[in-house]
Amino acid sequence: MTRHTPNRRARTWLGAGALLTTGALALTACGSGFNDTPGEGHASGGGTLRLLIGSSGDAETKAVTDAVAAWSEQSGVQAEVQTANDLPQQLSQGFAAGSPPDLFYLAPEALAGYAANGSIAAYGDDLANKDDFYPSLVDNFTVDGKFYCAPKDFSTLALIINTDLWSAAGLTDADVPTTWDQLASVAQKLTTDGRVGLAFGAEYQRIGAFMAEAGGGLVTDGKATADSSANVEALNYVKTHLNDGTFAFASDVGAGWGGEAFGTQKAAMVIEGNWITGAMSADYPGVKYQVAELPAGPGGKGTLQFTNCWGMAADSGNQDQARSLVEYLTSTDQQLAFSKAFGPMPSIQSAADAWSAANPDLTAFLSGAENAQFPPNMAGAADVITDFNAQLESLKTGDPQALLQTAQSNLEAITK
């Protein structure tokens, strides 16, 4: 996850965009990368280890910076952290200038492109803890049989319920929805003047959960399946309840994202990920809530899962030190510390029991991993999803089948 600010790109890609902040370590100047003179530099070697992260907010920045500082003191290797204000752009500029960071947050949808041009090192199989990562996360960062990079954490979507509003509507624990029909029913009971029953972002990264619950998805076994009947059913379900006023996009209730709609109580329920916990404690501490698994649809249970990895520059002269740092940052103790600080779930199986014990009210997020889909991660997928999101904004009045057929054509162009 993670405290997510009302920056849509940051919310959508779990840290791909970020606030520019200053941490405990010396942060390099922000701009086109790490080298002020484009073309002169190369990935550092034998000197300071450099990291570029896309942070969800101050809590994440401080946690990562402090962890890197602790490793630096322990290892004797200097390291510095830069927090990007536009991670994809700054990372691309760093590579173009010949001065990429040694380590950086890397989203799944960016992996294939960097792997294809040889920009990143495939170091996953060299990690001492490689067998501890969840297999589905390893798959997400594997290209052509090579495990490229260590998943740093992961998050899933769940149903977040305002418990005071729930009780006020006469609902009990027995009414927590487990089917689409039940979800529609409780959303109707929770909808009042000035408040919608259920809100979520007008984007695939939220609405895609309904597609998964219908038995659909954008890509199946490497083939584009956006225009499947299951996906049409999912979008029609969402459209129906957008029009009857019991569901709403966060933007339609004047909120920048689902967490804001929920925190300001413009929505009694939202579909969001782990990162909402940080926002609630920081910005809306008086709002009581519970987390439940998303209701099953015609295809059964389903949700979406998100992650980033620690990418490593192929030209880094500090690969041994960088790999050592990654092992430290993905260790059980450190991942549990990150989870406590800013909300994500550990990417390693050995931390699951401790995480569940420490977060008994959030276990629905972890349970969702059993039925979770990842957004497509092949080269070009990010652009396709951006276009799909633009069309989903008009779902309330649009033709679901037509929207999906456009997405199908775009996906076919990158999956052939």
Predicted features and spans:
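Helix-loop-helix "hinge/cap" segment bordering the ligand-binding cleft or interdomain interface
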Residues: 76, 142-206, 217-252, 314-320, ...
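Hinge/lid segment of periplasmic solute-binding proteins
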Residues: 108-158, 184, 192, 286, ...
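Long, aromatic- and glycine/proline-rich binding clefts that accommodate carbohydrate-like moieties
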Residues: 339-390
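Short, low-complexity disordered leader/linker segments with a strong preference
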Residues: 1-50, 73, 412-416
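A structural signal for short loop-to-beta-strand junctions that line the ligand-binding cleft
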Residues: 101-102, 130-166, 197, 300-301, ...
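Conserved C-terminal helix/tail region of periplasmic/extracytoplasmic solute-binding proteins
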Residues: 2-3, 167, 173, 370-416
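Extracytoplasmic/periplasmic substrate-binding proteins
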Residues: 54, 236-318
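Extracytoplasmic "Venus flytrap"/periplasmic binding protein-like
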Residues: 67-135, 168-170, 268-269
